[in-house]
A protein has these predicted regions:
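Catalytic micro-motifs at enzyme active sites that drive phosphoryl/nucleotidyl and oxygen chemistry
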Residues: 106-113, 183-193
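Short, conserved secondary-structure transition motifs
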Residues: 160, 164, 203, 233-251
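Catalytic palm subdomain of template-directed nucleic-acid polymerases
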Residues: 133, 137-138, 142, 195-197, ...
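Glycine- and acidic
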Residues: 49-53, 154-164, 195-202, 275-278
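Conserved short beta-strand edge segments in small beta-sheet-based binding/regulatory domains
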Residues: 224-236
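Right-hand nucleic-acid polymerase module
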Residues: 1-56, 65, 69-73, 97-100, ...
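Conserved pre-motif C helix in the palm subdomain of viral-like polymerases
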Residues: 53-83, 127-130, 157-183
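Catalytic palm active-site di-aspartate
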Residues: 125, 162, 166, 186-207
Length: 522
């Protein structure tokens, strides 16, 4: 098991972390709950839509790994969909740390089939679902609940967003909601096929039943102390068909570009970049456009394209910059290939990265800041990295700050600023602050006490032996890893390698899915 995949499920930030590199207690697979205390997660902000962001919360690593081993044998733990095969759309793959490839296309076909049968599709979702789950209502199968709540300062109201454990419990709870909905539709004699992806529900029904379907959804949610968000979309076959163009577009793009490519030539044009800009302009919303851009760079066509047989025109540079600016995540899957391309003049992108990185650091999107840092590192723009150290120090991006600490990029002014951030919520960057400071390492136990020990068991709070024992466990964990120079972040060349391995797994998974679907159709 790759612990990074469960610590940050789905989010690409997992590629930058190396939790498996850390040394854990020898009894971590059966770690006593009495060795753990309430801990505070770090906040990591990711882009949601327009000017909004969502906050992921990454739990204390010792607490999380202990919880993972405690819960990993629960029913359907690595096969979430099996808890509700009929209605659940979400298929998780812990080997890739992502949702299974190919499922979207299969489910889309099912949606169109339903829209041939029913008048419309109503899409509804649950308001602030993760934040409103009461942990006492979850089924722990007689396992200890505190492994979960200890990761979130002991809170029983709400789950941390971003890790696989929270996903598992949230999906198990959704299975119960789904069962209640099914019974209500049968009880009220309403013809309705429904499915759900996380807290996003798809109801296929006839127009005359629309209001009743929404009413039942509200009623069921209320019985679970939840409520529906204000967002509501109704689709017909025609409107749904016009909206869902992403898969068709990238397939057309590949077919079009393959026809233009001549293997005997060394001056082929990068038509696919122009085609991406053209095709995305026909998509309805920004989310679909970002999915389209990311998917093109993730598929085998681009990853194995013989770029040495292409020339780069001036317009290719500004179109590529446009795509990366629109979807910064795409940089993770593309810049390594362009950096290795002989005809690609990386100096053409220097000003773009100089301006965009600085602007990104002034905003709230931590993951995009990390993507820019990765691309700038791959292209070797060290001047851009260094000149933004002041903004990085105050960015609240603990992962990015840790990279700057590793590379000794901060001056004394920034270091002094960071040393004042002693609250527990800064434990991730403070771990690296100690690791890369000879001064703090020379007095390692005092440094751990000051920057890393959970606030519930700092020395001043240890008025009981049980608290002293807990404090000692965290002290040993941090001290062992710091003394053995174990960073939680990966070196950028290894990030590049891990991303390549992830993409290869995703491509193979997708290819197998379509091979299997072809067999089913025979």
């Amino acid at each position: 098991m790759n612990l990074n995949n469960v610590y940050n499920f789905k989010n690409p930030v997992k590629h930058f972390l190396n939790i498996d590199n850390l040394e854990f207690p020898s009894n971590i697979t059966e770690y006593p709950i009495d060795n753990l205390t309430w801990t505070e997660p770090i906040k990591f902000r990711i882009y949601k839509e327009k000017d909004k962001y969502r906050t992921l919360k990454m739990p204390n690593i010792l607490n999380f790994v202990a919880a993972y081993y405690h819960y990993k044998n629960l029913p359907e733990f690595e096969d979430i969909q099996s808890s509700d095969w009929v209605h659940k759309r979400l298929v998780a793959n812990v080997d890739t740390g992502d949702f299974a490839s190919g499922q979207y296309d299969l489910q889309l076909e099912g949606d169109f089939n339903c829209l041939c049968i029913y008048d419309n599709l109503i899409r509804l979702d649950i308001k602030e679902y993760y934040g409103r789950i009461y942990t006492h209502n979850l089924d722990f199968s007689n396992q200890e609940e505190r492994y979960l709540t200890n990761m979130n300062t002991g809170a029983t109201n709400g789950l941390l967003m971003g890790n696989y454990l929270s996903l598992y419990f949230a999906e198990e709870y959704l299975s119960k909601i789904s069962h209640s909905l099914e019974n209500k539709f049968i009880e009220n004699e309403i013809e309705c096929d429904f499915s759900y992806f996380s807290d996003d529900f798809y109801f296929f029904c006839n127009k005359k039943d629309n209001e009743e379907v929404v009413r039942i959804f509200d009623e069921v949610l209320e019985s679970y102390n939840l409520e529906r968000s204000d967002k509501k979309r109704i689709w017909t076959y025609e409107s749904f068909n016009n909206y869902n163009l992403v898969a068709r577009y990238w397939k057309k793009l590949v077919a079009h570009c393959n026809m233009r490519f001549k293997s005997e030539k060394t001056n082929n044009k990068l038509y696919f970049i122009n085609q991406m800009v053209y095709r995305m302009s026909n998509l309805d919303d920004d989310k679909l456009k970002r999915v389209f851009i990311n998917n093109v760079f993730k598929i085998r066509y681009f990853r194995e394209l013989p770029l040495e047989k292409f020339q780069v025109k001036e317009y290719d540079y500004h179109q590529l910059c446009f795509l990366m600016n629109f979807s910064p995540e795409a940089m993770l899957y593309s810049v390594d290939r362009f950096a290795e391309m002989k005809a690609f003049k990386k100096e053409k992108l220097h000003h773009f990265f100089k301006v965009r990185y600085r602007e990104c650091l002034k905003k709230n999107y931590n993951e995009e800041q990390l993507y820019y840092f990765y691309a700038i590192s791959i292209f070797g723009y060290s001047d851009i990295i260094e000149e933004n150290k002041g903004l990085v120090a105050k960015s609240n991006n603990q992962i990015l700050i840790s990279y700057y600490l590793r590379d000794n990029l901060f001056g004394q002014e920034e270091i002094n600023f960071l040393k004042n951030l002693t609250d527990e919520e800064y434990w991730f960057q403070n771990y690296h602050l100690i690791l890369y400071s000879s001064e703090l390492m020379n007095d390692i136990e005092a440094s751990i006490e000051n920057f890393l020990i959970p606030k519930t068991v700092v020395l001043s709070q240890c008025n009981k032996q049980s608290k002293s024992n807990k404090r000692e466990e965290y002290m040993k964990f941090y001290k062992t890893n710091l003394e053995n120079e174990k960073a939680i972040i990966r070196e950028i060349p290894f990030v590049k390698e891990v991303i390549s391995e992830y993409l290869e797994l995703k491509m193979k998974e997708s290819e197998k899915m379509f091979e299997d679907s072809d067999k089913w159709g025979e």
